[in-house]
Amino acid sequence: MADKRKLQGEIDRCLKKVSEGVEQFEDIWQKLHNAANANQKEKYEADLKKEIKKLQRLRDQIKTWVASNEIKDKRQLIENRKLIETQMERFKVVERETKTKAYSKEGLGLAQKVDPAQKEKEEVGQWLTNTIDTLNMQVDQFESEVESLSVQTRKKKGDKDKQDRIEGLKRHIEKHRYHVRMLETILRMLDNDSILVDAIRKIKDDVEYYVDSSQDPDFEENEFLYDDLDLEDIPQALVATSPPSHSHMEDEIFNQSSSTPTSTTSSSPIPPSPANCTTENSEDDKKRGRSTDSEVSQSPAKNGSKPVHSNQHPQSPAVPPTYPSGPPPTTSALSSTPGNNGASTPAAPTSALGPKASPAPSHNSGTPAPYAQAVAPPNASGPSNAQPRPPSAQPSGGSGGGSGGSSSNSNSGTGGGAGKQNGATSYSSVVADSPAEVTLSSSGGSSASSQALGPTSGPHNPAPSTSKESSTAAPSGAGNVASGSGNNSGGPSLLVPLPVNPPSSPTPSFSEAKAAGTLLNGPPQFSTTPEIKAPEPLSSLKSMAERAAISSGIEDPVPTLHLTDRDIILSSTSAPPTSSQPPLQLSEVNIPLSLGVCPLGPVSLTKEQLYQQAMEEAAWHHMPHPSDSERIRQYLPRNPCPTPPYHHQMPPPHSDTVEFYQRLSTETLFFIFYYLEGTKAQYLAAKALKKQSWRFHTKYMMWFQRHEEPKTITDEFEQGTYIYFDYEKWGQRKKEGFTFEYRYLEDRDLQ
């Protein structure tokens, strides 16, 4: 009886210890999980280990009592044993977590901890991708079936069932492609975080039902499947798959240019053909603000002769394709086409703005350039003395005679060439030159009078033409006239009138040309007075050009700078006449280069882009240097510091000998070697160390000394125990089993 009471008392004490131990274990467990740093975790883990050891001893005691037959009621003992085993399992988990190295097999095998929201997003994205793939596969199957059925129906005509099946398959293909398009848009929105995952989950069941059952006869499609996602309001960047073709403005320009009747002397734009360019290339060029070669031709009205193409290349001005070398035009020259009864008319401007000879101005479909260039065409023909033209005339590429012999004073080279105005070029010149007279020349064979402007100071020698068009005169009397201002699609140019001062003698008026014939279709003729008005001052001309450049700002993609012929005449005749005027100097108008790069103006940056730009700008001021990756060395200033007079002011005698250095301690020698680089002291310290059987390792930059005889010696290395001086920790270390390769041994004989 006493034994039983004693045993029961022991059991009660043991169970009490178990409950206290479990409570203590729980407390330490909580502290371990709330620990802020690794040191605390290690401490709590050690405490946990002690506590679990105590519990394990109590468990062993409980197990012996459970196994004995003396105790009848063992339920309490078994419960406490299970409680201890539960704590042991929990400790194993902690031990596994702390002992698992980051790059061990177990550590690498553990599942990566992923943010639940990110994981959900990836799952939905994967589902969208799989659904799109499934739909595309079904589309391929439908298309192959349609193809095979089409072959069969061609052989057997009138098979209505197969025709119905083909129609049904085509409807399925169309529906599938619609869903693929929508799902791809949703996927892009998901990648850009512009749609919620929950919104996609709402349509998931309907989409899966469509994919699985779209071909069932009793299938009912949900037509409002994507309505809740507001796919109509998504940004254009998410759905645009190809660049738009022609903008509305370009279509309008094209319609205007094609609907305007072409006069006998107006230049009409040639649409791009496969021989010279493609629509896609020209579109790309427009987008980039580049200029392509302009192709403009004069259209003879009645003679059916071929239009003349003028391809201008500023890189080779010595041999321009369509311009004979002669005086270059500044603003205009008068040309006439013999096909119209020889009527002389002012030639229309042949810039990229389009023909302006007819009353309604027509526009070439060039770039909607905000950089209208106020230019007079530059000299493209080489070193010839430039002569100005009357303001009512227009440059022509070369006025040819008729089939008969031309009189010797007809200027076949009156037309100079305008070099190609590149859309990315920011400089446009306004040129003014010496005075000129209007000379009248009549062509013989076709009774057509061809008026041209040329210098009268010297003999009129016709310059040889280098182009095919101007060198061949048509026998039917068709004059080959090439356009003079070859401004291309890179940007429209604004023709600024540049008046000239008259010679002392009166010049023949343009009214004499009316005797040759009447104007059929073209603008009203202008007859000049015997005295041509003098030019405005250059400052007003420059201000005109600057106003033109300023008014075509970045904000306005379609500039409205179009001068009519009336404006040109009025502005050119407004200044009072003067008897003599020195030649005007060259002036330039500057237009920002950025307009050539982005003709539609710069796109405003987002906040994120502005932030990135600021960060890049800041980083640019602190560029990394190769020395940034080097080990930081202690800086020892070399400047002498004042010392008290009772210290030695001179180094001791014989302190620069090897014997002196050999008497120094090893640590002092190492200090001299590592911190007095490039000095004689370093050299002497190295010499002293070598005499003490230290050897320098060039790979580790450390001094090694044999601790014992090497265990292995070969021609390439020796292996054994070494003592080395660690200059970073500043102390000697022992390394066992070190392989000293002789190729890293610094073995120069220090003399």
UniProtKB/Swiss-Prot annotation:
Induction: Decreased levels in liver and white adipose tissues upon fasting,. Residues 659-751 are annotated as: Repressor domain. Residues 294-315, 339-348, 463-472 have a biased composition (Polar residues). Its main location: nucleus. Residues 284-293 have a biased composition (Basic and acidic residues). The keyword Transcription regulation applies. InterPro entries: CCR4-NOT_su2/3/5_C_sf, CCR4-NOT_su3/5, Not2/3/5, NOT2/3/5_C, Not_N. The modification Phosphoserine is found at residues 299, 540. Component of the CCR4-NOT complex which is one of the major cellular mRNA deadenylases and is linked to various cellular processes including bulk mRNA degradation, miRNA-mediated repression, translational repression during translational initiation and general transcription regulation. Additional complex functions may be a consequence of its influence on mRNA expression. May be involved in metabolic regulation; may be involved in recruitment of the CCR4-NOT complex to deadenylation target mRNAs involved in energy metabolism. This is CCR4-NOT transcription complex subunit 3. It comes from Mus musculus (Mouse).
